[in-house]
From Swiss-Prot:
Keywords: ATP synthesis, Cell inner membrane, Cell membrane, CF(0), Hydrogen ion transport, Ion transport, Membrane, Transmembrane, Transmembrane helix, Transport. GO terms for molecular function: proton-transporting ATP synthase activity, rotational mechanism. This is ATP synthase subunit a. The lineage of its organism: Bacteria, Pseudomonadati, Pseudomonadota, Alphaproteobacteria, Hyphomicrobiales. PROSITE patterns: ATPASE_A (PS00449). Key component of the proton channel; it plays a direct role in the translocation of protons across the membrane.
Amino acid sequence: MIDPIHQFNVEKIFTIGHIGNQEIAFTNSSAYMLLAVAIISLLMIGGSAGRQMVPGRLQSLAELSYEFVANTIRSTAGVEGLKFFPLVFSLFMFIMVSNMVGIIPYTFTIASHIIVTAALAFLVFFTVLIYGFKKNGLGFFKIFVPSGVPGFILPLVVFIEVFSFFLRPISHSVRLFANMLAGHIALKVFASFIPLLAGLGIAGYFGAVLPLGMVVALTALELLVAFLQAYVFAILTCIYLNDALHAGH
């Protein structure tokens, strides 16, 4: 059986340079990150160039993406949250496009590496932290003190709130990483059964129908998961930003 983990290997394409003894390389992961950015750029530039009253497919897709993210921000962080639209939109589109590209056979799934998802999660975490203190000062600490909590359990609640706050980037990154990793491993495992069973002759052809059907179903599911994981990452970002925007509310 083909190794289902091999598809996640980061492979060097060429060396960029060195910092001390550390080699800086351009990898397949770097290439697919650039590809995702290029696809998003082409979509948004192509969709906004020569706009029509009756939009074409590209313009409709660009406008739909824009409005979807804008409405998500308004519903979770309020109108004031729209100042973070560039951040949330970039995260949503980058994760969704890279996830969908990764479903194509023989490509690379960027979000299958915890270092990538952790970088995105910590970007959100430090944005919330920095903006929260900039806007609210020491009042930002109010997010750790829920209103209406009886005084005798307040220290415990504050401890839990602080602990959960610093766990945010971990849960934020692991959720995306684990879902993409597990889904692609399942796809690879079922796909590897198809040629193995088909090689057994007529009986094998009939036996290969089941894994083939599973691959088709899992691929459809992965397309849905690719969107849902991007949406979950974006909406959690909005919820966290809401703490910075409206501390103590």
